[in-house]
Amino acid sequence: MPKVSVIMPCYNEEKCIARAIESLVDDYVMKHGEILVIDGLSSDRTVDIVTDFIKRDFPIKLLKNDKKLQCFGLNQGILAAKGEIIVRVDAHSSYAEGYVKKLVELLERTQAANVGGVMRPKGHTPVQQAIALAMQHPIGVGNAKFHLGNYKGFVDTVYLGAFRKEIFDTIGLFDTNCRTNEDAELNIRILKSGGKIYLDSSIYVDYHPRDSFKKLAIQYFHYGRGRAYTTVKHRQFTSYRQVAPPLLLMGLVGSLLLSLFNPLFLVFWGCYILALLAASLFTWSKRNISLKIRVLTGIAFMVMHTGWGAGFLVFFILPTRKHPKTRSGATLKKINHEK
């Protein structure tokens, strides 16, 4: 079996990282793998927790990411990795039994350049539960198959992913101008190089959402900004879900301003709110979900839409010192499928 390096960038994940590590480490990882935890100068107990695992002889190496951002941590982990295969993971999640082994087998079976499973958001508080529901609904996430599940086949992106290490010599490392959206940007380069991306929904990750709407808004603002950067860099839209939030936000702001002259323009707001309420109140009619959580889900939809849209638009409105480049770290070459 090929040696595997599991790359886990993190920052202040004391609440989640133990659960993430425990769910990843099994007989396969103990025999054939290593886990590289790249810490972005955490100020909580994250480092202490990881150090405790190392003392208990878990196959873990702890690296320090002085630049803090996730993209730098990912690249640092890839360069330090000893494995032939890189499995990219998130400290904010927990993983299905045999997760790493299943991805390695899927990578070899499909001969894809990147393989992954689906994200299953799991909330604990009412706000988290609402956000989790919003992240599993087309109104919240569009047609992204790794969110919606029940799909096996080739796609344009997956959640997290697994790669052969050699691919980074072909397409370059993660783009360090991407504070977020670095996964999607890398996947665009994979597709441009002739590689394929495969999703298997039987492989899943339990993702722990943000625990407040403020944190969700910040998260989606960065998502939108990152997607705008990727759109400019590659001069392409990969799906309608990229332009829907900024267009919606412009419509909401525009109709609000125009309503100062004619109240009829508020009809746009009314239709939007009714659509959110309908989605949150009636979509999961057969599930035992409280009215409170359903209403909170409607709020989560709005926060995700406006946060993402604002980030996308701000990228174009405010000047940036960093200009998108064609690649990151290597000359973009065609992937050799005959290896």
Predicted features along the sequence, with ranges:
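Short, acidic, metal-binding catalytic loop of nucleotide-sugar glycosyltransferases
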Residues: 22-32
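Cell-envelope/extracellular polymer assembly enzymes that use nucleotide-activated donors
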Residues: 3-5, 34, 185
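Glycine-rich, basic loop-to-helix element that forms the pyrophosphate-binding segment
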Residues: 65-81, 102, 154-158
